């Protein structure tokens, strides 16, 4: 049996995608609609307080295209905290006008493919801790997609030796390093949590960088032979103080 890669796991992750039911929202009187939005703003401002205590983080983006209108991404130390957030969100009046279109449950993950040998406790390493328990950037754009490593009769990632996988992941990682300073990447593991094995969340102030890195990696052997991808979601950042304009209906 091939050796399994060991992982370091950080904050639990929940991506929630919603489409706005504009037809139903349109017939709500303006004063009631304003109250819905204010309640939603207060909820998100309250959940965002974890950032100052370094016990979680969150991001809100307006998704481009018809797959969704809003992405809410929450990071928390425990899975049950994500359940609490989602349950409380569903009780908001605005939730009656937001249609769930997709969700993804995972956990921030680092693998040992490229790690050197050390007796150090990795969870005490400041660099590793910053990646496992990150402060999310306020970049203009976000890109999220789920993915698997292929396993069929011709190409099976899980039948490769650890050395073969390490070599492939090294080459794969060298492409990613070319985009340092242009893209911030977060990998979340989801084996046993969701329908794919990993989620990839990218941040950038230049949306074109998403196309460039994904295209370039198509020529990398790790992706070309072993990568399988779900739907891609791209969007622009939206702050809670912009909700009045976002939900405004003239």
From Swiss-Prot:
Amino acids binding Fe-coproporphyrin III: 131, 145-149, 172, 185
UniProt entry tagged with the keyword DNA repair: no
GO MF entries: heme binding; metal ion binding; oxidoreductase activity, acting on the CH-CH group of donors, oxygen as acceptor; peroxidase activity
Cofactor: Fe-coproporphyrin III
EC numbers for this chain: 1.3.98.5
Keywords of the record: Heme, Heme biosynthesis, Iron, Metal-binding, Oxidoreductase
Family named by the database record: Belongs to the ChdC family. Type 1 subfamily.
Assembly notes: Homohexamer.
Protein known as: Coproheme decarboxylase
């Amino acid at each position: 049996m091939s050796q399994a890669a060991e992982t370091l796991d950080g904050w639990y992750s929940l991506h929630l995608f919603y489409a706005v039911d504009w037809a139903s929202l349109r017939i709500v009187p303006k004063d009631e609609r304003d109250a819905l939005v204010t309640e939603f703003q207060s909820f998100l401002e309250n959940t965002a307080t974890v950032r100052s205590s370094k016990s979680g983080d969150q991001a809100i983006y307006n998704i481009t295209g018809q797959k969704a209108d809003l992405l809410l991404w929450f990071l928390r130390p425990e899975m049950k905290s994500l359940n609490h957030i989602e349950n409380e969100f569903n009780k908001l009046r605005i939730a009656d006008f937001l249609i769930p279109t997709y969700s993804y449950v995972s956990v921030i993950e680092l693998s040992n493919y490229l790690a050197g040998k050390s007796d150090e406790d990795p969870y005490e390493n400041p660099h590793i801790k910053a990646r496992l328990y990150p402060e999310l950037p306020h970049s203009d754009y976000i890109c999220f997609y789920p993915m698997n490593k292929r396993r069929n009769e011709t190409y099976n990632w899980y039948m490769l030796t650890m050395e073969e996988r390490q070599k492939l992941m090294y080459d794969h990682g060298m492409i990613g390093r070319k985009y340092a300073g242009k893209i911030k990447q977060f990998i979340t593991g989801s084996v046993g949590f969701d329908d794919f094995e990993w989620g990839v969340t990218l941040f950038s102030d230049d949306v074109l960088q998403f196309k460039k890195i994904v295209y370039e990696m198509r020529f990398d052997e790790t992706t070309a032979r072993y990568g399988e991808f779900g739907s891609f979601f791209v969007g622009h950042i939206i702050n809670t103080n912009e909700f009045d304009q976002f939900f405004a209906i003239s």
